Amino acid sequence: MFFTTSPDALFIPPATIDPVGFGKVAIVTGCGSGVGLACAQLLLAHQYSVCGLDAREFNYALLQEADHGRFHFHRADLTGPRACEDGVYAAVASFGGRIDLLVNVAGVMGSFSSADGVTDSEWDRVVAVNLTVPVKMMRAVIPFMLEKKSGVIVNVASTAGVSGAVAGIAYTCSKHGLIGATKNVAWRFRKEGIRCNAVLPGAIDSRIGKAIAAGHGGDEEFDAEAYAQVEPVHALHAQASESTPDITPLEVAQSVVFLATDQARTINGVSLPIDQAWNVV
């Protein structure tokens, strides 16, 4: 397997890659960079038709030209009214009336604020993007999956979804909630042929990962006092990982693709850590 050299690099698949997605349709949120981009690239390589959703414009140069015909980009702020439904309808209009796979990747970090310092705007924004949007996306795709008694949902959560010592309160709560939503959907629709799992990446080479390393949350400055309380945990993980390569977005995407295949037919409702043993600390 050829690994991308950066979060926004072009993925060139080997000639022998398994076309497990032939004839299937996938939706990927947050497709413009990092894990979302890697998922879109890898799913296309596996012959899925992919509808990518992102708030930023998409750079088609990051896809192989041969894959452009199986990729539809829909630009949207998914926190807007009916934006999730419109995104799903864009996929259905582009590729027919089926949705085989939903990958909820889109997320924001926030500023690491603790409970005594989090602002209403930070809380509302982080929870909206990281939890409300994935739930609304699941709500929108499940009727299409129920029609054919088949479908897979993979939610990209985080090690922060099982720990209180990794991120700020808004991000931590949003990812805990997403894991809970994953389990609820898995149990509720287990008899209808729908599987729902979560992957829990640790520190990865992505836009959010680079923001943490630089000491800011992308669009928001970190709460330095609150971040100081979780920084030792990040430092411990970084120290333990010095002898191994960074986790790449492609490696997370490979786990997503595995969970989407029939090889994972009996795997439902799991939270799969992808973190080089960070979750055991």
Descriptions of predicted regions:
Residues 32-33:
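Conserved glycine-rich cofactor-binding loop
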Residues 113-115, 119-127, 230:
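Substrate-binding pocket helix/loop in short-chain dehydrogenase/reductase
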Residues 138, 174, 182:
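Active-site helix of classical SDR
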Residues 138, 243-274, 279:
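C-terminal substrate-recognition "lid" of short-chain dehydrogenase/reductases
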Residues 143, 187-188, 265:
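Alpha-helical segment proximal to the catalytic Tyr-Lys
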Residues 158:
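Residue(s) in the substrate-gating loop at a strand-loop-helix junction
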Residues 190, 195, 267-269:
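Short, small/polar-rich loop/turn modules that mediate ligand/substrate recognition or access, typified
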